[in-house]
């Protein structure tokens, strides 16, 4: 029990469980005895009916649309906390990670487009390498223990949170299907109710969650991706403390283990099971996986390092105290671990086009993320051991 408690207390535990879930999915998807069960599980129909309202989806879509909305709720809470009280609370504090995140989104997307611009279908996946898996990246960073400066960890967290916020905006603007005006109207009404609750000082989290469930259903039916409802709810839950209690912080504390140890591993298990049957060298070296691998492994660190250098060169920001530029470059490589967020965007980009494209995209994401984890860990370990 002592070892188990120590494991779950470690920052690396979430990343390790993610790796195990993804490896298990790959194993089950490629073994004759389990591949059928794995795919049957994902295709299991699950129906929810409340009066005249009916939602009928398979298990995979419930995981991607409903459970991931809880993950995005946590992201919304974290972004709000950082903007109001944390490392993004002032322009001076926020400048360096914000500039780094912008570079870390623009350059990977451009590099992906350099490989795929001529193909109007695969071009739709331009945002795939722009994402960072915060849990995985922090998990790899935690493997280096107390040698990692606290300022470097805070920089990675702030960068990844801004990256997630960018991914949310990208999903809302570029990966939205045909819109239902009626459902959008219901969603707008639900948002107005959330705003009113916040303005009136309502601090019962359950009320926000109840209205959030209505918002999630309306957004799901509207054509906008339902996970965005989670972020919106997170922004409206009160953060200010009263009698020593903050509803937003309390909910964040409650959600964190559920997201880290259940929701994200379940998402990884449901989405990382890529069948290797029929995989050829020609396929692996096609523009789609190559663009993703290049975007994650080269584009991410290049964009972050370049934009950080420009920020320092023109005195727009300063290095976090106790860190070096070489360490920032290593963190840039770790940000190439796209994994869950990249897979999520790939499912939106190609989900209604061709399942085979999703498979090739997932392979590119898995290879690019794994290489980024290994190279980033090795580079940062060498930089931390290097004399100052």
UniProtKB/Swiss-Prot annotation:
One of its GO terms (cellular component) is plasma membrane. It is found in: Cell inner membrane. It is a multi-pass membrane protein. One of its GO terms (biological process) is regulation of pH. It catalyses: Na(+)(in) + 2 H(+)(out) = Na(+)(out) + 2 H(+)(in). The keyword Transmembrane applies. Its main location: membrane. The keyword Transport applies. InterPro entries: Na/H_antiporter_dom_sf, NhaA. Na(+)/H(+) antiporter that extrudes sodium in exchange for external protons. PANTHER family: NA(+)_H(+) ANTIPORTER NHAA, SODIUM ION/PROTON ANTIPORTER NHAA-RELATED. Belongs to the NhaA Na(+)/H(+) (TC 2.A.33) antiporter family. This is Na(+)/H(+) antiporter NhaA.
